[in-house]
Amino acid sequence: MSIRLDNISKHFGQFQALAPLSLKIEDGEMIGLLGPSGSGKTTLLRIIAGLEGADSGTIHFRNRDVTNVHVRDRRVGFVFQNYALFRHMTVADNVAFGLQVMERAQRPNPAEIQKRVKQLLEIVQLGHLAHRYPEQLSGGQKQRIALARALATQPEVLLLDEPFGALDAKVRKELRRWLRSLHDELGFTSVFVTHDQDEALELSDRVVVMSNGRIEQIDSPVELYAQPNSRFVFDFFGNVNQFAGEWQNGQWVNGSAFIQPPESDATRQSGLLYVRSHELALSDKENSQASLPFEVVSINPVGAEVRVELASVGWQSQELWEAKLSHRSLSEKRLSRGDQVFATPQVGYFFASEGQSSPSVLRWPFLAPGSLMFEI
């Protein structure tokens, strides 16, 4: 079922939780609401559910105006971060609860309820735990039961509030794959809240990035990563290095460091250059188009990559820089703490100091043959 929000706003006293915003969610789409604490994402989810009322605007489920419809009559399933399972009920009774409290005219008979519960427990792969109690389950199992309970009434929309926030990293990853597979199999419309960038990018058809009650960007995970449209989106996604450069004599200068940009009117001014850690090359010497001297601070193998932390030498950077290398490249030419290296951006995203809300994307093919210490 499609969802349309038009000019939704919300205040709590003097605090503006949501500025007027609009959003269209397609039938069968999985949407991630992503943002830091206080961005308004949970408030927006609760307004869609009917757990909060909007101060202004309208909400449509398909062609039905549900702005003033009670949560009970919206046909939504809601999954909470803390599971909200009834401790005194068995797994089967928890799943059946929503069906048992439906109005008499709509309530299935006991045999149908039992059949539906059995089907749902098989879907979430926990049929063998039907007679256990929540305290006997792991966190991942509790979350699956909470999801089965939300699906029991056959909602047209499934809403999830940080569904994996209380789980460890390995279980979170497994449940993300499982939920995406279940969503594709059953075809319901889903909206979930998260502050985890990886979770949003892995699960969502589109990601809605929020900040201070406003929508910063709506895009597919691929487009969002490839073309962030604001400084906030860059900063929030992390793993981004920043070079603050003053425009002098055809290049950006910061202390002893400089970068010469490709010819472009948009970049011939002071501003901030963002460089992702995997789009940064390390060299044993400077070149004519970039000189960013660093000292190696730490070398940290993390899974399939090696993360090298770098401290600026002779110029100012508010934070350490990071470069991501492959294990193969690091084994070919050793790198140690305290080594002096030069970094060169391969791709950069430039924001002018004034009047530019979206970045200019720049690419440099400048390293001379043989000057690379490591290839990313």
From Swiss-Prot:
Residues that coordinate or bind ATP: G35, P36, S37, G38, S39, G40, K41, T42
SMART domains linked:
AAA
Source superkingdom? Bacteria
**What kind of membrane protein is this, topologically?**
Peripheral membrane protein
Q: Which reaction does it catalyse?
A: sulfate(out) + ATP + H2O = sulfate(in) + ADP + phosphate + H(+); thiosulfate(out) + ATP + H2O = thiosulfate(in) + ADP + phosphate + H(+)
UniProt subcellular location:
Cell inner membrane
Q: Report keywords, A-Z.
A: ATP-binding, Cell inner membrane, Cell membrane, Membrane, Nucleotide-binding, Sulfate transport, Translocase, Transport
Main subcellular localization, coarse class? membrane
Q: Where is the ABC transporter domain?
A: 3-237
Alphabetically, the GO molecular function entries are: ABC-type sulfate transporter activity; ABC-type thiosulfate transporter activity; ATP binding; ATP hydrolysis activity
Q: What is its EC number?
A: 7.3.2.3
Provide one Gene Ontology cellular component. ATP-binding cassette (ABC) transporter complex
Query: Family per UniProt?
Result: Belongs to the ABC transporter superfamily. Sulfate/tungstate importer (TC 3.A.1.6) family.
Q: What assembly does the database describe for this protein?
A: The complex is composed of two ATP-binding proteins (CysA), two transmembrane proteins (CysT and CysW) and a solute-binding protein (CysP).
Q: Which NCBIfam families match?
A: 3a0106s01 (TIGR00968)
In Swiss-Prot or TrEMBL terms, this protein is called Sulfate/thiosulfate import ATP-binding protein CysA
